Amino acid sequence: MDIIEIIENNRIQATKDVEISKQKLYEQYFTPSDIANYMSNLFSNFEKENISILDAGAGVGNLGAICSLKYLNSGKNSFVSLTSIEWDKNLLEYLKGNIQEIQNKYINFHASIYNEDFYFIAQKLLTEGISFDRIIINPPYSLISKTNNEQLEILKKLDVSTPNTYSNFIELCYRLLSDKGELVAIVPRSFCNGTRFTKFRKKMLKNVKIEFIHLFESRKEVFKEYGVFQEVVIIKLTKKKIKKTKICISDKLNDNCCEKFNFDQITFKNDPYSFIHIPSKTDDLEIVNKISKLSSSLNELGLSISTGKVVEYREEYLTEEDYIENARILYQRHVRSDEIDLSVYNPSKPFLKQNEITKKKMIPKGNYIIIKRMSYKENKKRINTGILKKEHFDRTHMTVENHLNYIHKDSCGLDENLIYGLNAYLNLEIVDKYVRRFSGHTQINASDICSLPMPNIEVLKKVGEKIMNKKNNDYSIEELFFNK
């Protein structure tokens, strides 16, 4: 049995030993050996004799071990030094065992293991000016603990303020890279878009280059033995100067589905959120070129998008009383194929009592675009809308449940022709493909819609008029927007 087989068997055994509940609590999942090997092979050769490797959040140590073997077996490096950091003492036996397997065979291998919080060690390493040539990580995916004051204090001192543990690890790790260092990480795709990660993306893109992204087609394949359904990417960051980014979209761990893109096709200079786009093929460039020529945005149209303010499980003013002063609640089940159907779902308490507290949760009678927040990559469409018209209101106000977003103008409705034009645009196939480039979430965020280039108000209203009057028979809807 070779070393990699032994390491993989140790990972499988650790998975059985460590309670799944604990793994899910910290959302830390051990990397299978085929993925660990693939990640290690993304690193370029290292010409210097001595190479330093960091495995932060090492778990059972298989990533750092397999990465070390790559360089030990290359014959080009006289000395390989691995630093592994893992806070969970229950994993130390497996971590030490995997490291020992390599030490037994290679005399030019040195390993340091820290049973410490990575934030604490990272602060120490950065203070001492220590850096690494190669860093490989599969960090925990959990949110930042608001109760761990020691961690929060360290992150504050280091000026790290990302919303998630994995993004903290990425930021600290690229700061620990040597001059031509490389970082390979397997992480959720969620950092690519959304306003919560805007500051993180801007800092990352300023300090390192994205050399490689591998997006798995299925959300279920990567960590299937753990029942993880997040969309996951492997990303390679480097401090070297590069001109192109290689993108692979496949469940297979090879280069057969890879294409190279210019860096300005991955991120756009005029995007205030610095979204990271993951094009699926070169044909996507036609989509980008078409949409990027549009001159407006939701904000420039004078429109806003808000999330429904009724959170059902904690709303104390829900009622079954169908009084005219109470507001009907709009739920996501009411949104069906561009339409609103209020007959399809009637919970036991479908109204919200109107009072001084709930008034601000209500929208006045008018025309709105309603957008479902929950949206999976497997769905036929990522943006699922419905037109809420004045006729749907059987009273002066309505309210929107939290699983929906709605587009409005100064908290009121829109002109009917604008509603139809904007809804048609959001439902274009080309817009769907554009959104899929950057949104890997299980939901469509308000910021996703805000970041979309839009036609100007005149075009939207003109198309809306044609749709209302059914005068678009000679053209496809897309042609009405893009063939001027």
Regions found by a protein language model. Give the residues of each.
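A structural signal for isolated positions on well-ordered beta-strands in alpha/beta enzyme cores
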Residues: 52, 81-83, 112, 184
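Short, conserved catalytic or adaptor-binding loops enriched in Gly and charged residues
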Residues: 102-108, 203-207
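Signature of N6-adenine DNA methyltransferases within the class I
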Residues: 24-25, 29-38, 58-65, 79, ...
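Class I S-adenosyl-L-methionine
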Residues: 1-76, 83-101, 122, 139, ...
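Conserved SAM-binding strand-loop segment of SAM-dependent methyltransferases
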Residues: 107-118
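Conserved acidic residues
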Residues: 51, 133, 368
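Short helix-terminating capping/connector loops at secondary-structure junctions
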Residues: 47-49, 74-79, 105-109, 127-130, ...
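Polybasic, glycine- and aromatic-enriched phosphate-binding surface used to engage nucleic acids
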Residues: 286-483
